Curated annotation (Swiss-Prot):
Cofactor: how and how many bound: Binds 1 Mg(2+) ion per subunit. Binds 1 zinc ion per subunit.
Main subcellular localisation: cytoplasm
GO cellular component, one term: cytoplasm
Name of the protein in question: Phosphoribosyl-AMP cyclohydrolase
Lineage top rank: taxon: Archaea
Length: 129
């Protein structure tokens, strides 16, 4: 018999941290090759929605609300796997990315390479159409 989502989350042994007055944890999404696509925060509610639907939901601290990845752009993330870090305050998701992950039009949000000698950044990768 399958457990309900609240029981699943309880069994994950997570430690939601107080971030900007909300109980959140860090969520990292990668593609099937391990390339980092993005990081965002998750609330217990967004984690619950992610488990229930099989698609990534996050918590936006700037908009103070839950959001489904791709709800406006169509660039959704279907969950393949999830891993918990050793402290229980971060989750690593392997996802099937439709379109690009970054709201700036890049596959990854990590497209600004920093030169540690100057602090200046260079864009790596191409914008996707």
């Amino acid at each position: 018999m399958d457990l309900d989502v609240k029981e699943i989350i309880k069994n994950m042994n997570l430690k939601f941290r107080n971030i900007e007055g909300k109980k959140l944890l860090l969520a990292i999404s990668t593609d099937k090759y391990g390339n980092v696509l993005m990081t965002a925060f998750m609330s217990e509610e967004s984690l619950k929605k992610s488990i229930e639907t099989g698609f990534m939901h996050y918590y936006s601290t700037s908009r103070d609300k839950l959001w489904r990845k791709g709800e406006e752009s169509g660039n959704i993330q279907k969950i393949i796997n999830v891993f918990r870090d050793c402290d229980g305050d971060a989750l690593l998701f392997t996802v099937e990315q439709t379109g690009w992950a970054c709201h700036e039009g890049y596959m990854s949000c990590f497209h600004n390479k920093i030169d540690l000698n100057t602090g200046k950044s260079t864009v790596v990768g191409n914008k996707l159409d």
